[in-house]
A protein has these predicted regions:
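Mg2+-dependent prenyl diphosphate-binding active-site environment of isoprenoid biosynthetic enzymes
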Residues: 8
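Glycine-rich anion-binding loops and their surrounding alpha/beta cores
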Residues: 1-5, 13-199
Length: 199
């Protein structure tokens, strides 16, 4: 597993060595841990689900955010327009808070507002069952390991690379197709796995 920490030197070392780090929200917003059990018990999305990305403790210059509906996407768009961030706010029209490749996806960024389909990335639309995450946390972990080990299905790899590609294109200010290709190269060459192993 990955060690969660809010120690600045540990996190800087992770970025220097692996190129990534994990910011586990409860460590940075301790008051939120008191709210977590209530949120779980309610079983519905709350204001706190919406607030999370806006209170990122690292104040990133580049940010990709997935949202669960178009109304929230529009609200985030208005809020992010008031910042100097490079941002992409994503909502798949079939309900995912990420790029699913199961249909069209709307992206609002500081560059544009676009609707795109899998074909824009040169891949085919997929079925929801092709990206099913399993029934348990263990199932999901096995799928993740297979993908990062280069043993994912084409559908799994494409969805991972579509999302990573948008994050890359947001930070590098390149088009999504170029970001997708960079993500695919990183995944299939094993570079993504090497970064994870260094964490």
């Amino acid at each position: 597993g990955i060690k969660f920490s809010n120690d600045e030197s540990f996190l800087k070392k992770s970025i220097d060595e692996a190129g990534i780090c994990v910011l586990h929200a409860p460590l940075f917003h301790p008051a939120m841990k008191n709210v977590a059990p209530i949120r779980r018990e309610l079983g519905v999305k709350t204001f706190f689900n919406m607030l999370g990305p806006m209170v990122n403790p690292s104040f990133p210059k580049n940010q990709m955010v997935g949202v669960f509906n178009l109304e929230l996407q529009r609200l985030y768009g208005y809020l992010y327009q008031q910042t100097d961030k490079n941002y992409s706010i994503v909502h798949a029209l079939d309900g995912y808070d990420e790029i699913s490749l199961t249909g069209k996806t709307k992206v609002i960024s500081n560059q544009s507002e676009t609707m795109f389909s899998p074909e824009n990335l040169g891949v085919s639309q997929i079925q929801q069952q092709e990206i099913f995450g399993g029934n348990t946390v263990d199932d999901a972990a096995k799928i993740f390991i297979n993908v990062i080990d280069g043993k994912g299905t084409e559908a799994q790899n494409n969805v991972v690379c579509a999302n990573a590609g948008l994050a890359i294109s947001t930070s590098k200010q390149i088009n999504h197709k170029e970001g997708f290709e960079l993500a695919k190269e990183s995944l299939l060459s094993g570079k993504a796995k090497q970064s994870l192993d260094k964490l």
